[in-house]
Curated annotation (Swiss-Prot):
This is ATP synthase subunit beta. One of its GO terms (cellular component) is proton-transporting ATP synthase complex. GO terms for molecular function: ATP binding; ATP hydrolysis activity; proton-transporting ATP synthase activity, rotational mechanism. It catalyses: ATP + H2O + 4 H(+)(in) = ADP + phosphate + 5 H(+)(out). The keyword Ion transport applies.
Amino acid sequence: MKKENITYGKVHQVIGPVVDVIFTESSQLPRIYDCLSVKLAGEELFLEAAQLIGDDIVRCIALGPTEGLARNEKVTNYNHPIEVPVGKNVLGRMFNVLGKPIDGKEELPKKPQLPIHRKPPSFDDQSNTLEIFETGIKVIDLLTPYARGGKIGLFGGAGVGKTVLVQELIHNIAKEHSGLSVFAGVGERTREGNDLYYEMIQGGVIDKTALVFGQMNEPPGARMRVALTALTMAEYFRDHDNQDVLLFIDNIFRFTQAGSEVSALLGRMPSAVGYQPTLATEMGQLQERIASTKTGSITSVQAIYVPADDLTDPAPATTFTHLDAKTVLDRNIAALGIFPAINPLESTSRLLDPNIVGINHYKVALGVQNILQRFAELQDIIAILGIDELADEDKIIVERARRIRNFLSQPFFVAEKFSGIAGKYVPLSDTIQSFKEILDGKHDDLPEQAFFFVGTIQEAVEKAKRLKKATVEEK
């Protein structure tokens, strides 16, 4: 950094996370998004320029706590946006919003670094082909396929397997696609981030992952920008290393919430439900950078908190417009012991189209959904009258639906140490063929238990033989 590029100002006023800085000359004023710093309790507090007020004052958002900051403190303007480390060095490491390591390991080299505010790929560079991103997880690949370079919303409460699903996706892209993952913890619990870090070490996927955290105890400035820090790291892998990158954002709602916290202090008039008037713009600036190019892709999985379960709330509603697929984790399915506990009827994807996935995949997926839908409709009758009162045709549907429901379960690699069952990666072609055979009634003679926690249909057949043998031996 050249010395002549640096200019100096003074703290004019402090209102919570918003700091006004005054400069003596207008030529010294920073540009919007420029990075500034001020000494506070022996450490550097970083600020980001957000508004220019009058001829000599710039209003900034603090990226750390402002307690103890006094007027007339000297402020350094670096004349460039926040820059964070990128490249292979960030893998296996954990960072804060400024790209500084928070895992207690050695500092990273100064280069390469990139600014966190960047333009999305141009139309010429973006890939215009819709392509399925194979995850190896049956229920996802069949019923709610993910797009390469797409955006997926992950809806799930506490304890339904959201973290395990995230880890399995990271594992599968690392092992099967030689891909990389970047995890952004936005405004969530510090304990959860800590648990995730150590679980990734145990699962053997940390070396293919970079983690960036701006947790809920941090100021709104950090929570607003941490997703951009993670995205910048992912963009480097996509653009320079031509990699397929998986970007996890947990939780995208906290990104919106942080913007809402500082919006009023920046003097903006609140819009619907008290959100910032720039909500759609801020969301668009983040989401448009998550894209697939001709050489690599960023596929994002975004956990979404829905305030008061109101899907019409402006924050989730603004996010929905950008999503390609919706994966819903259901507590009732988890209660049955079926994992991943994905609701096959509520989860959707715009890729489930015969022109994209092919007519065979589409027909099988539709057949599975129809049977499960009919099974759901028959549940009340079964509960009141019993299964014996159903028509023969409905009895067959119920039996097949139970087999399908069990077969949608799958042993995960990252859960091997808990379940004692070896993890399975199931190619899409095997998934389609397996469910087609169940729909055609080829395996109506197999017990329902044989379909539980297996990979392909061949494994279910083998498991049925083992169950039969065990039953004979018991007798």
